């Protein structure tokens, strides 16, 4: 009887790990796209996003059909949603860059690399969650530190963007 609960627990861990793996692969494609601007890479990223969405749908279906979960169902749902947000944003960024014909700047490439590193830490965290929760926490903290670096870098860049916007506005009036 207890073997049934163990198998159900493993389903959730496996699905979260799969979602994090696909997301990490997707963010690596974001970095690669920024290096090459290759449309095939953009298409690969779009496929990864769809794969990640499918894994998330299966996870939600499993959550809805299960009474006992390895940890709080809202936490599982929130973790999955957060991982999904990462690949969604990567895909939408590349899609918009393709449509708007925007070339990545060195700043954008640095941010993408930091995001890739954070996605790797998230991937490592969910890999370790079941058997080594303390190690998983270390990886999660590293991911958070990388997120903070992205936010700090963005905050430093905002005044430059604002100045660029003012110049663009002035030029567009001419």
Language model segments and positions:
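Cytosolic, long alpha-helical scaffolding segments
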Residues: 1-174
């Amino acid at each position: 009887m207890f073997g049934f609960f163990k198998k159900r627990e493993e389903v959730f861990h496996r699905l979260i790990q799969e979602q994090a793996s696909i997301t990490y692969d997707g963010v690596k494609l974001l970095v690669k796209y920024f290096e090459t601007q290759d449309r095939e890479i953009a298409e690969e990223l779009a496929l990864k996003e769809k794969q990640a969405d499918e894994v998330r749908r299966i996870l939600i279906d499993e959550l809805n059909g299960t009474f006992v979960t390895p940890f709080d169902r809202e936490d599982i749902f929130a973790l999955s949603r957060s991982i999904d947000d990462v690949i969604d944003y990567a895909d939408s960024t590349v899609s918009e860059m393709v449509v708007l014909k925007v070339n990545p700047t060195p700043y954008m490439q640095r941010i993408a690399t930091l995001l890739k590193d954070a996605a790797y830490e998230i991937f490592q965290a969910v890999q370790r969650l079941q058997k080594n929760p303390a190690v998983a926490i270390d990886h999660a903290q590293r991911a958070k530190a990388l997120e903070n670096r992205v936010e700090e870098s963005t905050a430093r860049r905002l005044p430059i963007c604002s100045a660029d916007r003012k110049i663009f506005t002035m030029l567009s009036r001419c």
